[in-house]
């Protein structure tokens, strides 16, 4: 991400979020994520089908969900029960929303639906590990910018070939507070256009390890995410695995 002056750098250098809280400031792990607010801690709850949310929160709606926005533009996430969710955003700042699991790990993740950005955004599997602290992305779709970094090779998985990249974030917000940490990326060479896909996470984790990109403990969440940056668009995703 530390490619000064590029759009890739700017997507992670977004304006200060509400209450000074970044999405990386979520305190993750085992379904006990909490969001600090001006009035205290908002603990995860249980949402119900067809609930639309516009404020930062985590919880359970058939599956674990996470929603974060820096407050720019108009952004909403609709929880449709089970593994389904949809998003709508207009002239957003930066946001990330998705459903998945309160802890990451080796899974065969299946998804279907659509991801329709006008501008910069990712359709991706997204998560964190601890000790070492790593932020990881497996990107199957993107908008106007395809993410890159220091090239580490390729991995073939689930009918596609992914380029592997590594980047570093310095003194940046994370699930463990402000720290310097690595980012690991698998970015599909061609977008998934069929509306459905499979991500076998272990194939990527193993390829990263072969490239010397060591992961840590899966203490934090892993979601099939929609992310947008200074863009508009919509998505409708159902995830299972």
Swiss-Prot record:
Pathway: Glycan degradation; xylan degradation. Residues 1-49 form the signal peptide. GO terms for molecular function: endo-1,4-beta-xylanase activity. The keyword tRNA-binding does not apply. GO terms for cellular component: extracellular region. The keyword Secreted applies. Residues 1-22 are annotated as: Disordered. Gene3D superfamilies: 2.60.120.180. It catalyses: Endohydrolysis of (1->4)-beta-D-xylosidic linkages in xylans. It is found in: Secreted. Predicted to be exported by the Tat system. The position of the signal peptide cleavage has not been experimentally proven. Its main location: secreted. Keywords: Carbohydrate metabolism, Glycosidase, Hydrolase, Polysaccharide degradation, Secreted, Signal, Xylan degradation. The active site is at 135 (nucleophile), 227 (proton donor). Its EC number is 3.2.1.8. Belongs to the glycosyl hydrolase 11 (cellulase G) family. PANTHER family: ENDO-1,4-BETA-XYLANASE A-RELATED. This is Endo-1,4-beta-xylanase C. The gene is xlnC.
